[in-house]
Structures are given as structure tokens and as C-alpha cells.
Curated annotation (Swiss-Prot):
GO cellular component: cytoplasm; proteasome-activating nucleotidase complex
Subcellular localization(s) per the UniProt record: Cytoplasm
Disulphides: none
PANTHER family reported for this sequence: 26S PROTEASOME REGULATORY SUBUNIT
Pfam family membership, one: AAA
Record protein name field: Proteasome-activating nucleotidase
Length: 412
């Protein structure tokens, strides 16, 4: 374009000179606009390249750090056994021998306590880092991460029991100031007992849904271990984790598996169960305070539980979960039939009258079987006839009462 401007013909007259100058100015303005646009594009490219440079430099530093970490020698795992002074401690390495070692200046001396796990430098064996407390994998498996979906409204016929468990477990966690105002200690343990299928575990699941406390669930048989001391260690770590994450609730289902009365048994298995029970008694109400940890126990056999387990201070409230009466059965049937397509001729109270002696689990099965009969008969909705067939089938399929009442020997 510059050559074009330089080779424009020379103007001969005034009018030609005007047009010549106007055209030259226009060309210069266009050239200026073009150069400005190129400048903006170059500056944008420069900013993009600078951003890319910073990103690549960051990635290079990251990869260099990973390479250095891979090149660094591994650290030795040890356990602090004794504190000599602010600069020296006695540790036991993972190999077994004990050493008197120094402490890294970057560590907080208050974190170094006997029993703490630490990492040691391979050359000097100086303490480099304090590791978090390690719990058995089974203990982490007892944590309830996702709250159950059951609610108190879905439990029928247990209004009194629900109020008692909410007062003993939920109220101290949500309104502790009420107990401080009255000058009393809130209940720390609740034992639910009653026949199978009456809703003990369902109540505990509703508590887990309702409270915002950390919830840990364990079956009593999980605490029975093969080797000496393993069951007691699990109990100790379970309560340590509960205290660490307090406020928390520990639910021990089928507690009679480890809580049966102690007898003069000569078998090693029974003695190990007794050791586990004694550790549980000490953790529930022993020398040290267990903190803001609530305990819910559930059992079908309260008659065989050890007396030391039932005393106040361990289980302050013992709540019986009985088989539902007529009103309770009506409430339970209404809950289970709420989502079913039922004929209007079906009288829930009449069905409740016909199911005398049945518990909540039985009533749920009766509703499910009635729905299955309706599907089998290709009905549009569940009819009274379907419920009658379900009740008859449930009574005749298995001689449940005769099986329950039949006495027999128990084999280990």
C-alpha cells in the first residue's frame, strides 16, 4: 500500500489536488485502522502465551516435586513410648527395637504423646511427622455415612416408646441447656428389648435419620473375635472414634451376643466373650468419662443379659417394645397400605382384628402377600379377598408359633 501511495499521479489542478489529498488521507486512515487491529491481535496472543507459560511452569514445578518425592527415601513408622524432654523422646520402630531420638523443630511438642504413631527419618531416626490415629478397618465400616430414610412417622403403634427414646437420645444432643438448667445429667444409654419384628432396629434407624449426630452401627457378634484381646481392642477403638467425632450415637444391635451373663466357663471362646463384655462395661461407665456419646442397645433376650450391663449409668432407660395391640396394628397397616391401590371395601380395622398376635414385620408381610395375590389374579386393585388369602397363607405356610415355642438344644 505504501508503494501505491508513493506512485499516485501528481495533481495538475486545484480540484485534482483536493481529491488527491482526500484519497491519500483516507488510505492512511485505513492503514492506521488495519495496523491498530493487528496490534490488538498481537497483544491478545501475547497475553494468551503468557498465561500458557505460567500454566506450564506450574505443571513443571508439580512434576518436579513428584519426581523429588519419588526419589526421596521412605520413612520408618514408629510409636512414641516415652517423652524425655522437649527435644528427645523414646520411640519403638516397626522392626521392634527402641531408640532415643530427636524431634523436628517444625513439630508441635503438644502433639507428641505416648502411644502416638509417627514417621522416622531412615538415617537419624528423628521424628519427622505425627500420624493420625489408626483404627481397625472394621471400625470404619461401622460408620453410617448416609442417613437411613426411615422417619418416626413411618413407625406405628409405638408413640410412647418414640417419645421416650427422643427424650433420652435426641433431646440431649439438640437441647443440652435444658438439662444444665435442671442440674441433671442426661441419659447416656437406652436399651430396646422385645420380641423379634416389633421395630427395635427400625427405631434406631429413625433416630439416625432424625439426629445430626455421628452414627455408628455394630452387631454384637462382630465384636466376638478369634484371638485374645481382639474383641476388647475393637470395643476400645469404637468408643475412641465415637468420642473423637462426638456428638455421636453408637447402636449395638443384638447386644446379647456379647452381653450374656458371665458364668464359670472353661472354654477359651467364652472367656474371650467375657473379656469383650468387661471392656464394654468399662467404656460405657468406667473410670474415664466417655463424653458426649449416646448408646442404643437392642436385644430379643433381655433375660440373659448380665446385670452389670443393665444398671443405671450404662443403660439409664430400658424401653420395652411390645407386640402391637389393636390400635397399633391399625396404625401399622395404615402405614403399609398408604402406597397401595386398595379397594374401598377393605376395612383396615377388620384386618387388624383378624391379625391378633402379629407384630409389625408380620403385618408388612401380610400387606405384601395381599398385593402378590392381586397381581396373580390380575386385579386392578387389592381387594378384601386378597387380604383374606394373605392372612390364611401367612398362618398356614409356616407353623411359626410352633417353631418358636418348640424347645430344643442349642449347638455352638
Amino acid at each position: 500500500m505504501a508503494d501505491t501511495l508513493n506512485h499516485l499521479p501528481e495533481p495538475q489542478k486545484g480540484e485534482d489536488l483536493y481529491r488527491y489529498l482526500l484519497e491519500r488521507v483516507t488510505n492512511l486512515e485505513d492503514r492506521n485502522t488495519e495496523l491498530r487491529e493487528q496490534l490488538r491481535q498481537i497483544e491478545a496472543d501475547k497475553r494468551y502465551l503468557e498465561t500458557q507459560k505460567v500454566r506450564y511452569e506450574r505443571e513443571v514445578r508439580k512434576f518436579k516435586g513428584e519426581i523429588e518425592q519419588m526419589k526421596s527415601p521412605p520413612l520408618v513408622i514408629g510409636t512414641v513410648t516415652d517423652l524425655i524432654d522437649e527435644n528427645r523422646v523414646i520411640v519403638r520402630s516397626s522392626a521392634g527395637p527402641r531408640f532415643l531420638v530427636g524431634i523436628s523443630q517444625s513439630l508441635n511438642i503438644e502433639e507428641i504423646k505416648p502411644g502416638a504413631r509417627c514417621t522416622l527419618n531412615q538415617q537419624s531416626l528423628a521424628i519427622v511427622e505425627i500420624l493420625p490415629t489408626n483404627y481397625d478397618a472394621q471400625i470404619y465400616g461401622m460408620e453410617v455415612i448416609e442417613a437411613p430414610s426411615e422417619r418416626y412417622e413411618e413407625i406405628g403403634g409405638l408413640e410412647k416408646q418414640i417419645n421416650e427414646i427422643r427424650e433420652a437420645v435426641e433431646l440431649p444432643l439438640k437441647k443440652p441447656e435444658v438439662f444444665r438448667k435442671m442440674g441433671i445429667e442426661p441419659p447416656k444409654g437406652v436399651l430396646l428389648h422385645g420380641p423379634p419384628g416389633t421395630g427395635k432396629t427400625l427405631l434406631a434407624r429413625a433416630v439416625a435419620h432424625q439426629t445430626e449426630a455421628h452414627f455408628l452401627r455394630v452387631v454384637g457378634s462382630e465384636l466376638v473375635q478369634k484371638y485374645i484381646g481382639e474383641g476388647a481392642r475393637l470395643v476400645r477403638e469404637l468408643f475412641e472414634l465415637a468420642k473423637k467425632k462426638s456428638p455421636s450415637i453408637i447402636f449395638i444391635d443384638e447386644i446379647d451376643a456379647i452381653g450374656a451373663s458371665r458364668t464359670e466357663s472353661n472354654t477359651s471362646g467364652d472367656r474371650e466373650v467375657h473379656r469383650t463384655l468387661m471392656q464394654l462395661l468399662a467404656e460405657m461407665d468406667g473410670f474415664s468419662n466417655r463424653g458426649d456419646v449416646r448408646i442404643i442397645g437392642a436385644t430379643n433376650r433381655i433375660d440373659i443379659l448380665d446385670r452389670a450391663l443393665l444398671r443405671p449409668g450404662r443403660f439409664d432407660r430400658i424401653i420395652e417394645i411390645p407386640a402391637p395391640d389393636i390400635e397399633g396394628r391399625v396404625s401399622i397397616l395404615n402405614i403399609h397400605c398408604a402406597g397401595m391401590n386398595i379397594d374401598k371395601k377393605v376395612d383396615i380395622r377388620d384386618i387388624a382384628t383378624r391379625t391378633d398376635g402379629k407384630n409389625g414385620a408380620d403385618l408388612r408381610s401380610i400387606c405384601m402377600e395381599a398385593g402378590m395375590f392381586a397381581i396373580r389374579s390380575d386385579h386392578e386393585m387389592v381387594t378384601l379377598e386378597d387380604f383374606e388369602q394373605s392372612i390364611e397363607k401367612f398362618s398356614n405356610d409356616f407353623e411359626r408359633d410352633s417353631l418358636i415355642n418348640t424347645s430344643g438344644a442349642m449347638f455352638a
